């Protein structure tokens, strides 16, 4: 199979899975294994296509991101969504990521740990659905600092491969009395700085594995991931309010079984 076709397939996988509660890491490892695309070059490729997904969110939410640069609501102590909400949602994961980055990359990016993350994340999502109460935050402007910080702590779970950033943060939002749409949008916004920081750090360390010959493949993967992520996020927001997290949780358990059969055994 040609590199361009592999790039196209993995770009679709990344674009679909990055902001859905199904674990992009688990999918990329499984599909990469089935395609025979593994090793350091594959890891560097995954970093590049993540940037495509990040760009999609930056464009979809560019107005909200620009509004965060306005510090007047923060200075006036207005009850309105502002940069401090994002800071509270990001800070715990940044600390966890910096402290555990090398340990995670060295020891936790293994197939069996991803299976554990898939199942553990599924259990959390089911529990969140069962335990959720009537939402008090039905828009980003309703979000309290305490709710933002709670979701931020749940994002720390996503440093474990296979757990899923969207799965952990949306679950945390439901448990903190935030509705589906608001929890999802906040999840996307706080993912941006964390992902930009993590992918930049990874790219600096993986730069030596890139060559000029890789540019066409990496470009196809990046563009595909960007387009698919744009479509996936818009569709997901509409779908989540109708079906909730449980179908995604059951899918994760199925993926863990497939992962075990095709990768571990």
Swiss-Prot record:
Reaction(s) the record says it catalyses: di-trans,octa-cis-undecaprenyl diphosphate + H2O = di-trans,octa-cis-undecaprenyl phosphate + phosphate + H(+)
Main location group: membrane
Biological process, per Gene Ontology: cell wall organization; peptidoglycan biosynthetic process; regulation of cell shape; response to antibiotic
Residue stretches in coiled coil: none
InterPro entries: UppP
Record's keyword annotation contains Disulfide bond: no
Misc. remarks from the entry: Bacitracin is thought to be involved in the inhibition of peptidoglycan synthesis by sequestering undecaprenyl diphosphate, thereby reducing the pool of lipid carrier available.
HAMAP family: Undec_diphosphatase
Protein name in the entry: Undecaprenyl-diphosphatase 1
């Amino acid at each position: 199979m040609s590199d361009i076709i592999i790039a196209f397939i993995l770009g679709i996988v990344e674009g679909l899975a990055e902001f859905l509660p199904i674990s992009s890491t688990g999918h990329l490892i499984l599909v990469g294994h089935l395609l025979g695309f593994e090793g350091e070059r594959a890891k560097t490729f995954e970093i590049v296509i993540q940037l495509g997904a990040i760009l999609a969110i930056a464009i979809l939410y560019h107005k909200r991101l620009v509004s965060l640069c306005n510090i007047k609501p923060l200075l006036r102590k207005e009850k309105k969504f502002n940069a401090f909400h994002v800071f509270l949602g990001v800070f715990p994961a940044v600390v966890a990521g910096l402290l555990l980055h090398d340990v995670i990359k060295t020891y936790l990016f293994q197939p069996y740990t991803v299976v554990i993350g898939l199942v553990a994340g599924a259990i959390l999502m089911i529990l969140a659905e069962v335990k959720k109460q009537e939402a008090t935050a039905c828009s980003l402007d309703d979000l309290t600092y305490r709710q933002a910080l709670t979701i931020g702590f749940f994002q720390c779970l996503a440093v474990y491969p296979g757990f899923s950033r969207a799965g952990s943060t949306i679950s945390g939002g439901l448990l903190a009395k935030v509705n589906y749409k608001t929890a999802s949008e906040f999840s996307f916004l706080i993912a941006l700085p964390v992902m930009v920081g993590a992918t930049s750090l990874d790219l600096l360390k993986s730069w030596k594995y890139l060559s000029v010959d890789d540019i066409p493949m990496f470009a196809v993967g990046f563009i595909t991931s960007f387009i698919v992520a744009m479509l996936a996020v818009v569709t997901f927001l509409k779908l989540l309010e109708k079906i909730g997290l449980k179908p995604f949780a059951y899918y994760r358990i199925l993926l863990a079984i497939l992962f075990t059969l095709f990768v571990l055994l």
